[in-house]
């Protein structure tokens, strides 16, 4: 992050100048551990920037180009804020430097320590003071709550309010390492664990913010565990309150993702409020929310808000409790407390509005997540078609399952839900088996021969037909297969890890290994603990040379080293041209000292 901070400043300044609009840069990594950091870019309306502007900024930051466009446009105006991470002030200074590289006269408002919603709020309405606005809301609340602030900026804000109904914990903003550590909304949702501070009072409602205070979840103690009131429960309570206040619910909607439990969806529909499912991600929820008079949307992690695109007389008190452009954990908390207070609903009654169906969510690694494409709302696969057909076969009217590609790595997420836990578990096993059989190992064809890509495994020692794996290595260098027994081989495999691994190519139906490549990743102190990839021991069975398997092995290794800032290999002179064709180039000289 440090390495690209200047360029981020320059890129946002360019966009601000080009559009003649103010922009915001929030330095935060939200719910992540203290050693991570990142930025969120905000437009002049306090909204998240559109995808096209996000792409423009990313392309400039990731390019080698350090030049900037014509400066004969408007003067950039940038608002900057950051949360409590140790690296934030340094990143802020570098971003300011980058802004001034574009134009030294740029207008820069450094707000320093703020929450993400606070910076959005500032851009939405410069005349309103966020803390004063929160104080006015507090005057309307007397419902007690204990709030875990994740040792983040939320504690810094709440401690300024000092109201009797509000008890705070985990407010240590000085010890950077405590940020989000065994506390905060993500910890509560993911681990279903009690935060480190937990007050033993069974009869009190508890809440947890995350590090930059843009999300909130609620819970109460139940023996040694907690009953979680997540984003769906938050949406349900708000929808219930609105349904009692408004006669015509036609233009009111609850926006959710496929991960919302069907019991929740059915509860909302019974209230007379429509539900709309979008793709995962707050940007997708927010985009749909703009289409209705009132839209309620919360992800299960507690990130969300209520958008009042049209004011309703009976809801004017409620409207002021929700952030107008983005999820705000503190305002959302106050809004929920206001509803509980107005309706006299207990936390137990809130929790029992509906009961979730049994469900299971799992993540599986696949060889190429780009093989998986979904409908717009992600509830069905459009590719691979046979996988969706299989899902339709194993699910009945009481069960559902959807699959979607996830994140930057080659993973897919599988969600299964049903009325019966045994049925859910059975479908989970079927999904795991299907994915393992079809998508974990890459399959490809060369010269009408079918191959798979795999990791070297202990059972590969058992292949006895010539050439075995050890015989294959003897085509590369000196090795005596007779001197390596099963125990030695197994110990070697046990010592392989994510930074030292061997990829092999096999015939699909015989499992004979016909190609192998070794990858090592070395973590450096330089380049912010950057990694260097080393490619070693590339070999293809001599009977299959000329099939393109060597190029395939190198491509596999390069893909595995995507998190490395450079990749190094050494080779014999006769192989130099081959590796040049694979994208490698001369870089210095490689010397070696072999022990006799």
Each language-model region and where it sits:
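Phosphate-binding chemistry for phosphorylated carbohydrates and sugar-nucleotides
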Residues: 2-6, 46, 52-58, 77, ...
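Catalytic-core signal marking the mid-to-C-terminal active-site face
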Residues: 341-444
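Short amphipathic alpha-helix that is part of the acyltransferase structural core
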Residues: 445-487
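A short helix-loop-beta-strand connector motif used in the catalytic cores of GNAT acetyltransferases and
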Residues: 493-504, 534
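Conserved beta-strand in the GNAT
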Residues: 504, 512-521, 539
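A short, internal acetyl-CoA/4′-phosphopantetheine-binding micro-motif in the GNAT/acyltransferase core
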Residues: 536-545
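Conserved acetyl-CoA pyrophosphate-binding loop and the N-cap/start of the following alpha-helix
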Residues: 544-556
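Conserved active-site alpha-helix within GNAT-family acetyltransferase domains
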Residues: 551, 563-569, 573-595
């Amino acid at each position: 992050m440090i390495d690209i901070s200047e360029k981020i400043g320059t890129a946002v300044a360019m966009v601000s100048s080009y559009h003649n609009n103010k922009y915001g840069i929030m330095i935060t990594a939200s719910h992540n551990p203290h050693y991570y950091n990142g930025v969120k870019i905000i437009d002049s309306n306090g909204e998240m920037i559109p995808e096209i502007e996000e792409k423009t900024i990313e392309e400039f930051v990731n390019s080698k180009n350090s030049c900037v466009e014509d400066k004969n446009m408007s003067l950039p105006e940038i608002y900057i804020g950051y949360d409590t991470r140790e690296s934030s002030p340094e990143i802020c200074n570098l971003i300011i430097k980058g802004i001034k590289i574009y134009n030294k006269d740029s207008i820069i408002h450094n707000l320093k320590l703020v929450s993400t919603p606070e910076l959005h709020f500032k851009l939405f309405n410069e005349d309103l003071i966020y803390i004063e606005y929160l104080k006015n809301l507090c005057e309307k609340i007397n419902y007690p709550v204990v709030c875990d602030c994740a040792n983040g900026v939320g504690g810094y804000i709440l401690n300024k309010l000092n109201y009797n109904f509000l008890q705070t914990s985990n407010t240590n903003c000085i010890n950077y390492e405590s940020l989000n550590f065994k506390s905060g909304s993500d910890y509560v949702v993911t681990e279903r664990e009690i935060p480190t501070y937990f007050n033993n009072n069974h009869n009190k409602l508890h809440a947890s913010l995350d590090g930059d205070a843009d999300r909130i979840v609620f819970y109460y103690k139940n023996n040694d565990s907690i009953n979680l009131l997540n984003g769906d429960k938050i949406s349900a309570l708000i929808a219930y309150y609105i349904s009692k206040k408004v006669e015509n619910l036609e233009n009111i909607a609850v926006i959710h993702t496929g991960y919302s439990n069907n019991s929740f969806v059915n509860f909302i529909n019974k209230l007379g409020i429509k539900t709309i499912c979008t793709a995962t991600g707050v940007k997708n929820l927010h985009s749909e929310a703009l289409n209705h008079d009132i839209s309620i949307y919360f992800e299960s992690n507690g990130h969300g808000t209520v958008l009042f695109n049209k004011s309703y007389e009976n809801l004017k008190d409620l409207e002021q409790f929700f952030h107008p452009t983005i999820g705000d954990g503190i305002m959302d908390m106050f809004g929920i407390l206001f509803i509980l207070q107005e309706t006299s609903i207990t936390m137990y009654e809130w929790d029992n509005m509906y009961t979730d169906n049994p469900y299971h969510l799992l993540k599986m690694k696949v060889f190429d997540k780009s093989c998986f494409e979904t409908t717009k709302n992600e509830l069905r696969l459009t590719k691979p078609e046979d996988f969706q057909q299989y899902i339709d076969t194993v699910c009945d009217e009481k069960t559902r399952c959807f699959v979607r590609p996830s994140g930057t790595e080659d993973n897919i997420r599988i969600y299964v839900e049903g009325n019966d836990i045994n049925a859910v578990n059975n479908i989970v096993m079927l999904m795991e088996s299907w994915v393992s059989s079809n998508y974990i190992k890459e399959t490809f064809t060369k010269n009408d021969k079918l191959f798979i890509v795999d990791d070297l495994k202990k059972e590969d020692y058992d292949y006895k037909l010539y050439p075995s794996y050890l015989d294959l290595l003897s085509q590369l260098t000196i090795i005596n297969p007779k001197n390596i027994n099963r125990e030695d081989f197994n110990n070697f495999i046990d010592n392989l890890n994510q930074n030292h691994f061997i990829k092999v190519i096999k015939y699909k139906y015989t499992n004979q290994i016909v190609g192998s490549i070794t990858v090592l990743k070395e973590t450096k102190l330089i380049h912010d603990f950057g990694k260097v990839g080393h490619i070693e021991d590339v070999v293809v069975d001599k009977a299959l040379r000329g099939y393109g398997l060597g190029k395939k092995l190198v491509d596999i290794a390069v893909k595995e080293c995507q998190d490395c800032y450079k990749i190094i290999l050494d080779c014999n002179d006769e192989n130099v041209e081959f590796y040049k064709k694979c994208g490698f180039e001369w870089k210095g000289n490689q010397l070696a000292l072999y022990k006799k």
